[in-house]
Amino acid sequence: KKIILSLSIILLTFISNAQQTATLLYHWQDSTLVASTAHNNTYNECWGLEINSYEIAVIGSTAGTHFFDITDPFNSTEVAFVAGAYTGTGVIHRDYHDFEGYLYVVCDEGNTSTLQIIDITNLPDSVSTVYDSNALLTRSHNIYIDTTSAKMYSCGTNGTMQVYSLESPQNPILIYSYNTGVHDAYIINNIAYLNCGGNGLIIEDFTMVDTIGDQPTQLASFTSYPDAGYNHSGWLNENKTIYAMLDENHGYDVKLLDVSDLTNISVLSIFNSGVDPQSMAHNGIIKGDLLFISYYHDGLRVFDISDPLNPIQTWEYDTYPSNNYAGYKGAWGVYPNLPSGNIIVSDMQTGLY
């Protein structure tokens, strides 16, 4: 079956607490790219950039990494593409994070995959690959860069989480291997909120980890909570008091945690999209008082969490209209941090919105 892919940008204008459907601004299709054998997904993660006063959307596919100038959403255009070291129907995951004018790219499939570092400072005119090697890592599920400490955390690398110094952004240096399995992470000022699958949420302080042999300090372990499943991902609010935690299981709720005291973490509320008993959240990002979630089959879901005891769903956009809730389909990633307020959402089967 031919897969029709789309790239679109959604503009959200927040004017009330009533749930509203977001407005679609731009749509791009490419029917030439193949889908994965595993999940029939051609796209995976999305990311956003502001470079030289231009807004750029980054999209991962089975072919590689696509860059779009979306400064004027109605006239958006693809401006660059970097092929993956591993491509084709075996690709499911790619992941991205940027630091100091470079985009860091990983893939979780293929024995020929690499860490790619792409110079993005000349966008929207061009990009250039400055590093493409498996000397440090071959496969990685997720990466997160703590820009405050110039460290990159690579999750799911050889069964560990590896920590790299980015003091020289083009030449990462491995400084630590964390031997507990970590699926995803959020890190700021060396404090790492680690989503460890069946081992729940672990919080570690990596302040003293600068060379091989140094050890982090564990600050908390949170494993017993309502709807505890596969602890998949999470995001911290700006005040470092509220943490949104997502377990990747059909029918499991999103949790808001009080993390103001790491010796006494508590669940403030649990909630869901309200669409289907088998709905499943994937990734979330907190911006201000809003929690943006790529909610798999239910598309984009936005919650007002100004009262963390009573989150209110305010916006939605269904990127995957099918009512089949089996497997992994629909919205994969979300990026709400562009200066314009435009929101990027990637859908595994229908492209990027």
Whereabouts are the PLM-identified features?
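Bacterial Sec-dependent N-terminal signal peptides
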Residues: K1-T21
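Feature marking well-ordered beta-strand scaffolds used for ligand recognition
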Residues: A18-Y353
